[in-house]
């Protein structure tokens, strides 16, 4: 990893020389290797991370650790939750997805400038629409069928990740895919949150 972060630092330095008017961010997996980033990539301006930590959000310690090691602003470059839970009704799964997103939204808002740790720039929801090709390769898995095979255990409602079910909108039953978009409960949640924020 130190070679990787050293290379990131070289890139950030070059970008700054070519375009000093824009910040340079890194996309990291959660808060792994903060010590190495601090030592080998000081030229980055923004710490970005893909983080999937559960319905409660990211946890204050996430933002505190970034502040302690890097003293840089944080952008959550990817967060989300599947809208499928094995053996549970669709409505239950969608509500679980929405509550997960709500926890993430609240945690981000509570740690923006002037609040909490104060180092959050924002977050990027993963993702707009379900992707039916992510469960695995043909012939075992089909891109024309939304798979319900769990990919790995994780901090999600029901305890499992279902990679093809992250969308704020679904593709329905697939008869009109890839063009049909059906709004999920989490889409409606964000619609309301943006009105109030």
Regions found by a protein language model. Give the residues of each.
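Extracellular glycoside hydrolase catalytic/binding regions
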Residues: 1-110
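Glycine-centered small-residue hotspots that permit tight backbone geometry or close packing
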Residues: 10, 27, 48, 80, ...
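A structural motif corresponding to the C-terminal end of an alpha-helix
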Residues: 10-22, 107-120, 181-197
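Compositionally biased, low-complexity repeat tracts
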Residues: 17, 23, 76, 118, ...
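Arginine residue identity/basic-tract feature
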Residues: 53, 60, 68, 88-90, ...
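Active-site/pore-lining binding-face segments in mid-to-C-terminal subdomains
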Residues: 89-141
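Aromatic-rich peripheral "rim/lid" segments of glycoside hydrolase catalytic domains that contact
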Residues: 126-197
């Amino acid at each position: 990893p130190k070679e990787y972060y050293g290379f990131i630092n070289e890139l950030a330095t070059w970008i700054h020389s070519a375009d000093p008017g824009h910040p340079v961010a890194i996309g990291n997996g959660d808060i792994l290797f903060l010590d190495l980033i601090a030592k080998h990539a000081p030229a980055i301006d923004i710490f970005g991370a893909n983080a999937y930590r559960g319905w409660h959000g990211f946890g204050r310690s996430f933002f505190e650790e970034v502040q302690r090691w890097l003293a840089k602003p944080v952008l959550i470059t990817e967060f989300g939750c599947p809208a499928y839970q094995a053996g549970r009704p669709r409505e239950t799964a969608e509500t679980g997805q929405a509550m997960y997103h709500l926890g993430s939204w609240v945690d981000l808002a509570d740690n923006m400038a002037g609040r909490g740790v104060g180092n959050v720039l924002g977050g990027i929801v993963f993702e707009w629409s379900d992707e039916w090709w992510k469960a695995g390769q043909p012939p075992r898995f089909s891109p024309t069928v939304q798979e319900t095979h769990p990919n790995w255990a994780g901090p999600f409602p029901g305890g499992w990740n279902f990679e093809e079910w992250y969308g704020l909108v679904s593709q329905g039953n697939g008869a009109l895919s890839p063009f049909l978009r059906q709004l999920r409960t989490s889409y409606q949640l964000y619609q309301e949150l943006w009105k109030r924020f």
